[in-house]
Amino acid sequence: MNITASYIRRKLQGRYDPREAGNLSRIICCEILGQQTVDYYLGKDIILSVKEEQELESILARLHNFEPIQYILGEARFLGRTFRVTPGVLIPRPETEELVEMMLKELSPVSRVLDVGTGSGCIAISLAKELPESQVTAWDVSGEALSIAAANSKALQASVRFEQRDVLTYEPCVADCYDVIVSNPPYVTEAEKQEMEHNVLDWEPSLALFVPDTDPLRFYRRIAVLGLEMLTSGGKLYFEINRAFGKDTVAMLCETGYRAVRLQKDISHNDRFVICLLYTSP
């Protein structure tokens, strides 16, 4: 019997549902304490040193405070790659993996791509790795996020240019010319805070999460306006969105001058992505 795994699940009881507690137990045993996965599933126990016992108690205390396991590990997986994450950046989500996979099916292998609000760099770096002939630029307002993204890019040997930009105030210059702009900007309204889990609300950066209730599309609107000047004719916008504002986002983009605007659902059947084209006069 794996006494250590049972102990972990028991300590997490009441804070996490049984399935999540079991998953956390496996991660702790295999990824932190070094147990072989096959031994874990065979129910073999781990002999812990005093130092490992202390480390385990520290981890359990952090989990008791709902700190995400990705921050405890210092990393998260995204499309088969490992990205460093800290509380200064959002933890990459499966929905964002869907967005990148969609882009990879649709984009030219030689594209000029801008990722607005790059965070850990997971979108920009993944695109740069899968489309090595493309030129990928990534913006973020947070210097801490850019530092983490640049470290991820170096570790994964990706070619991405990182720039500190506040998209709400930035004015484009002649050099800003892109075939594709992608963004997963802040989109959670203040009113939605009460619905959020503690591990998100208490730990992930509010700068990357929230928008005012009075203007939930503020980032999408600004990026769309910038796109009018920065996108080539036939250029594309890709947005990950709040499922509550799909139709509003589509309407805003149509009013701004974009064409072929489409609203797409994620694997959970929620409105999650908006894609559109820009056609400009010669």
Give, region by region, the residue ranges found by the protein language model:
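Conserved SAM/SAH cofactor-binding pocket of Class I
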Residues: E95-E195
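Conserved AdoMet
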Residues: C30-E106
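Conserved small/polar residues in nucleotide/adenosyl-binding loops
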Residues: Y279-P282
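Conserved Class I SAM-dependent methyltransferase catalytic core
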Residues: D213-C276
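Active-site beta-alpha loop architecture of Rossmann-like, nucleotide-cofactor-dependent enzymes
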Residues: Q70, V188-A191, A244
